[in-house]
Amino acid sequence: MGQLPKPSKISFGTDGLRGRVDTMLTPALALQVGYWCGRVLQAEGPVLIGMDSRSSGSMLVAALTAGLTASGREVWTLGLCPTPAVPGLIRRYSAAGGLMVSASHNPPEDNGIKVFGATGSKLSPERQQAIEAGLCGGDGSGMALAASGAARHRPELLDDYRASLLSSVGQHRLDGVPIVLDLCWGSATACGAEVFSALGADLTVLHGDPDGTRINVNCGSTHLEALRRAVIEKGAAMGFGFDGDADRMLAVDGQGRVVDGDHVLFLWGSVLQEQGQLPDQRLVATVMSNLGFERAWQARGGLLDRTPVGDQHVHAEMVRTGAALGGEQSGHILSSAHGLAGDGVLTALQIASLCHAQQLSLAEWVDQSFQAYPQKLVNVRVENRERRKGWADCAPLSSLVQEAEASMAEDGRVLVRASGTEPLLRVMVEAADQAVVDHWTSSLAAAAELHLNAS
């Protein structure tokens, strides 16, 4: 039997593997990842593979398929689809697991691989480490090829995913509601316009075709300017912008104001609370969520659990506590009633249908929610991974963080963390006063730039 060559050291970040296709995420590496995923996944059944619209996607899917079939696995490729379609279809068809080829909100030249187990959840750290060990371990002697598995292209399975989106809103309709969708040239183009149109919405679509060279470029949830303009120009009730793989969404109300994940959690959570469908009145959010949100939710008698950044941490806490709803300020929203997978299109459908059912505009609903504290996030590029990850060991920077925290006391927060997907140190400051926020973000970002990038 043949053997596969051993790649250099790699590791999973906060959302799988991610990087530039021409340097880090090569076809050779994807073949290896496919092989070791096939070996590490424990359940029987096919392995599903979806992809976003990036130009490198088909190449990487082919390499992953080769690796998986080399491990003896049967593979079903889905083609273009949102990330949440993969875990949903894993559960529906009792698959062994699945992979999504996407770099989410990253630029077009990047790509990534997300891995899901038989329950539809992202792999545990232990399973990820087993794949890493296989990729990088020993002399490759354990990597003998198995008898080849089969591969089939199954795009028709996405009809089940679209049907699940429509059923998620029950009998609610959106007849005549003017809505703008920014599909980001990405995965949301596979279903976003179709499901909103099926519910009767008066739809305007931006960036509505799959385009791997323009995915995330000045559009979608990370660049809301075009969506905000379109909502105002069209006199729309609301707009929704998705990221490249459609697992997250940010909204815009009829006044052009951004409605982030904190507001989505508060609004959807309030409805569940009033319906008696929110155990312990609990929501799960991350350390990035706004203090104004937390205090307003507590004023409603609710509990807010915070986790580290990353929807996998939100997922784990929801499972641990039995929470019904959780998510991130950036727009990943997880609902236990809908499979605990972040799904931007599903979340947009929920918000639109709940607004319509209550006969409220999104702007009116947001005005009834909470006043966010001023919050500012600055990204400092730090190429040195060790310095970036170990920023707290930099005495001048950590001392300045402590000074900022002491000066704001209970009226503000500082959060400094290394990105899990990009060479960035993220500096966030939140306070009751905008001038205080501006002062400390500027000071902390300058200190990080000076001390972490020093030669």
From Swiss-Prot:
Gene name in the database record: glmM
Name this polypeptide is given: Phosphoglucosamine mutase
Post-translational modification: Activated by phosphorylation.
This protein's UniProt keywords: Isomerase, Magnesium, Metal-binding, Phosphoprotein
Function recorded in the entry: Catalyzes the conversion of glucosamine-6-phosphate to glucosamine-1-phosphate.
Co-factor binding details: Binds 1 Mg(2+) ion per subunit.
Catalytic activity of the protein: alpha-D-glucosamine 1-phosphate = D-glucosamine 6-phosphate
Modified residues (Phosphoserine): 104
The EC number(s) this enzyme carries: 5.4.2.10
A Pfam family this chain is assigned to: PGM_PMM_II
Family designation: Belongs to the phosphohexose mutase family.
TM stretches of this protein: none
Binding, Mg(2+): 104, 243, 245, 247
Active site: 104 (phosphoserine intermediate)
